[in-house]
Structures are given as structure tokens and as C-alpha cells.
Curated annotation (Swiss-Prot):
It comes from Vibrio cholerae serotype O1 (strain ATCC 39315 / El Tor Inaba N16961). Belongs to the uracil-DNA glycosylase (UDG) superfamily. UNG family. This is Uracil-DNA glycosylase. It comes from the Bacteria. Excises uracil residues from the DNA which can arise as a result of misincorporation of dUMP residues by DNA polymerase or due to deamination of cytosine.
Amino acid sequence: MSESLTWHDVIGNEKQQAYFQQTLQFVESQRQAGKVIYPPAKDVFNAFRFTEFGDVKVVILGQDPYHGPNQAHGLCFSVLPGVKTPPSLVNIYKELAQDIPGFQIPPHGYLQSWAQQGVLLLNTVLTVEQGMAHSHANTGWETFTDRVIDALNQHRNGLIFLLWGSHAQKKGQMIDRQRHHVLMAPHPSPLSAHRGFLGCRHFSKTNQLLQAQGIAPINWQPELES
């Protein structure tokens, strides 16, 4: 089943559930009421669009989308080209520069190249109101992303989950450590990065774990031109 399962199956199943219909109706009603909701409707499910279920190698869990203009586009930690790199991603790049030989910090925060190589960049909550962090928490998204993680946990093997910060680590408690690899560190936010995110070497460790399974490593270098 795992080879043939797709996000269309997983998400299609959830769309039949009352809780998820309510979540989608809530988000749509907020947009209809004139509130600015990020990311745009066309981008909400981009994490699944760019990384098919059977192609996932690595899962990075974020919290909720960036809530400033033109930032969020459906991939956690990533921002659209032309937007200033947010502080957490600055620290991710700082760690990559220490961890991966030859890594050059790009002048942008666009991580689509990671997604296209099998890195699922998944926020726990997939929408947010402009300027209001966590405004769409507890509206059903957490249940949906629990089901997503559960599907990966049950139907895939040897995935590498990068859980940064207590929120992601709590979310990842269900992951079967016998089937998958779980790497944990503090969140890359400026508030906590110096408590152990910087120096965690998760990117080189991820590639070592992939290569040990005979799987191609991730090229963590985003294009220097956005």
C-alpha cells in the first residue's frame, strides 16, 4: 500500500471528515469577511504539491505560517523570493554554513529546491491571519497534520524527522523510532538557537542517515539566484 499511497488519498480521506470540512469553511469564511489570511488559498497545500507522499525522505515540522505580507507560501521556514530572510531561517543558514562544506548563504529564503528533493516542509497549522501569530491554532489544522504524520509513520520507512523546539517535539511523539529516525534540537528562533540548534549538525546527519539506506542525500544549497 505504501508505494501506491499518494497525498491525494490521504488528503481526500480527511476532506470527507466533518472536522476538516469545518476547518476549510472557517478559513474561507475569514477570507470572505475581508480578513487577510496567509498564505494565499492557492498555496495552502504547497508542501504536498512539491513533495509527493512516496518521495518524502525528510520531514521538517514548523508551527504556523509567517504572518507578514508576501512571506508565507505553504512551506515551513521558507519565504518567497524578494522577501527578507526571516530570523529563524537566518539561523538555519548559519548552521548549514557550519555543517555543510562549501555551503554559501543565499540572498533569499526560498526553499522550494529542498521540497523538490523530498524534504516535506510542514507547518502544524496551515493558515494564519495577517499580523496575528497562532490566530488559526485550534481550528482543526492540528488534527489534519497529525493524520498526515500518522500516514507517513505507518506507510513509510526510514524517514528522517527534524523536530526543532518543544512544539515540534510534542507533535512528533507519535513517530515510531523503530521505523524512522528522529533528530531533535531547540528551535532556530533567535530566542533559542544558541541553546543547541547552532551546532546540532542535523543537515549532515540527515545525509549520513539517507546514504546509509542507499538513498541520495539532500543538496541543502538553495540556488544563489532566487
